[in-house]
C-alpha cells in the first residue's frame, strides 16, 4: 500500500484503434507524447496497455495518466484548451499523426483511494504482471467510497490467494459516486486462469461476490497487457531516447 495518501488524479482512456495500428499508437503515446507531457504538464504515464480482445472490444488500448491533483489537471486543461482550435498549437503535428492510428476514445477522470500507490511507488516496489485485470463497477449512487473500503478490507485478501495484487483503486469523478475502477497485476496467465476457474467453486470468492453485490449493480472484467514502454514493464517513465526503439510507418 501507499506510504502516504495518494493526492493525484488520473485520466483514464479507452481508445478505439484503426485496423492494425495498435503497436503504432502505443509507441506514439509513450515515446512521442509522454516525455513532452512530463516536462510541460507534470503528467506521468501510469500505464498504456493493449486489451486482450477475447475479453473485451478490439482492437483497443487503455491509457492511464497521473496528474498532480485537480490543480495540476486544471493547469493542463488551460495548456490544452485555451486556444481557438481547443488544442495546443505546438502539438498539431502530433495530433495529426495520432489520428492515423486511432478513431476515438472515451475518457474519465479518476480519484484514487488514498491508499492506492502512485506510479513511482509501484515502480519502486517492482510491481509488474504478465497480464492485468481491469474491473469496471457500476454501483448504487453514493457508494463508491464505501465500496473501495470494502475492497481494501475484504476483497484484497481473497484475490491475493491467487497471486493477484491490487495496484489501482479509483472512483470516477464528475458523477454521483456510482462508478469504481480496479486494476490488478497478475504474475502469470495461469494465475488468472486459476482464479477464473474458481469463481463458482471457491467459497471465499463466492462470498466476496456476494459482498460486492450489496453495493454493485453490475461489473465487468477484462484483461490488459503492457505496451513495450509501459512503466510497469520497464520500471521507469518513457523518455525521448525511446523514440528510436520502434519505427512508425511513413
Provide a role label for each language-model segment:
Residues 9-11, 59, 103, 131-133, ...:
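Residues that flank catalytic or metal-binding motifs in active/ligand-binding sites
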Residues 1-8, 126-128:
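Extreme N-terminus of proteins, especially the signal/transit-peptide cleavage junction
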Residues 12-24, 112-190, 228-250:
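Surface-exposed interaction/gating patches
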Residues 53-62, 175-181:
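The conserved glycine-aromatic submotif of the RRM
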Residues 2-5, 23-47, 53-58, 66-109, ...:
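An amphipathic, aromatic/His-enriched active-site/gating alpha helix that lines ligand/cofactor pockets
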Amino acid at each position: 500500500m501507499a506510504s502516504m495518501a495518494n493526492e493525484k488524479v488520473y485520466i483514464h482512456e479507452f481508445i478505439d484503434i484503426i485496423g492494425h495500428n495498435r503497436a503504432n499508437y502505443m509507441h506514439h503515446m509513450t515515446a512521442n507524447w509522454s516525455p513532452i507531457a512530463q516536462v510541460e504538464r507534470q503528467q506521468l504515464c501510469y500505464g498504456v496497455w493493449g486489451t486482450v480482445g477475447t475479453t473485451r472490444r478490439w482492437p483497443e488500448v487503455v491509457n492511464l495518466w497521473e496528474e498532480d491533483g485537480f490543480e495540476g489537471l486544471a493547469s493542463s486543461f488551460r495548456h490544452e484548451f485555451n486556444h481557438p482550435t481547443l488544442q495546443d498549437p505546438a502539438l498539431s503535428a502530433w495530433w495529426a499523426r495520432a489520428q492515423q492510428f486511432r478513431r476515438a476514445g472515451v475518457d474519465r477522470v479518476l480519484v484514487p483511494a488514498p491508499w492506492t500507490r502512485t506510479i513511482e511507488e509501484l515502480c519502486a516496489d517492482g510491481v509488474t504482471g504478465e497480464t492485468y485485470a481491469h474491473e469496471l463497477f457500476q454501483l448504487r449512487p453514493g457508494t463508491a467510497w464505501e465500496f473501495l473500503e470494502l475492497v481494501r478490507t475484504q476483497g484484497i485478501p481473497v484475490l491475493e490467494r491467487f497471486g493477484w495484487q491490487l495496484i489501482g483503486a479509483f472512483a470516477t469523478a464528475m458523477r454521483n459516486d456510482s462508478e469504481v475502477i480496479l486494476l490488478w497485476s497478475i504474475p502469470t496467465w495461469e494465475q488468472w486462469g486459476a482464479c477464473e476457474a474458481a469463481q463458482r467453486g471457491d467459497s471465499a470468492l463466492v462470498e466476496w461476490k456476494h459482498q460486492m453485490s450489496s453495493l454493485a449493480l453490475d461489473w465487468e472484467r477484462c484483461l490488459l497487457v503492457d505496451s513495450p514502454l509501459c512503466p510497469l514493464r520497464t520500471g521507469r517513465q518513457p523518455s525521448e531516447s525511446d523514440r528510436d526503439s520502434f519505427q512508425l510507418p511513413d
